[in-house]
């Protein structure tokens, strides 16, 4: 029995060694995200664009890279502002409230993201007519 098992392992090693010799000329695969210098998955975004488009699944290769870059930039921007908001409140964890304060505090992001953020609360605001006028006099 030991002879049969040993023979099979030897044969497997030789075929693995042969395939390793063939692969020496090939380069390691490089993802499109790393080629573009992005963290967001270009391949996944490309697949989702193809699934959701009306043009029979025809999406240009650069469209996915551009979309991934835009999403990564907007995410970084929102996370930076939310991190600043959480740091101002002396908290180490970003909550939906911090995201709400960050987005509504920035004029451009506020116009871009008009949806409701669950658990975000409301933005503190006191109308000018309600502020005491006694300090003026």
From Swiss-Prot:
Xref: CDD domains: HFD_H2A (cd00074)
Looking up Pfam families in the UniProt record yields:
Histone, Histone_H2A_C
Instruction: Show the InterPro entries listed in the entry.
Output: Histone-fold, Histone_H2A, Histone_H2A/H2B/H3, Histone_H2A_C, Histone_H2A_CS
Q: Report the leader peptide range.
A: none
Q: Which domain of life is it from?
A: Eukaryota
Sorted alphabetically, the keyword list is:
Chromosome, DNA-binding, Nucleosome core, Nucleus
Listed GO CC annotations: nucleosome; nucleus
Residue ranges for the region (Disordered) are 1-45
- Name a GO molecular-function annotation: DNA binding
Q: Extract the SUPFAM superfamilies matched here.
A: Histone-fold
List the subcellular locations. Nucleus; Chromosome
Principal localization? nucleus
| Record function comment | Variant histones H2A are synthesized throughout the cell cycle and are very different from classical S-phase regulated H2A. May replace conventional H2A in a subset of nucleosomes. Nucleosomes wrap and compact DNA into chromatin, limiting DNA accessibility to the cellular machineries which require DNA as a template. Histones thereby play a central role in transcription regulation, DNA repair, DNA replication and chromosomal stability. DNA accessibility is regulated via a complex set of post-translational modifications of histones, also called histone code, and nucleosome remodeling.
Q: What is this protein called?
A: Probable histone H2A variant 3
Organism this protein belongs to? Oryza sativa subsp. japonica (Rice)
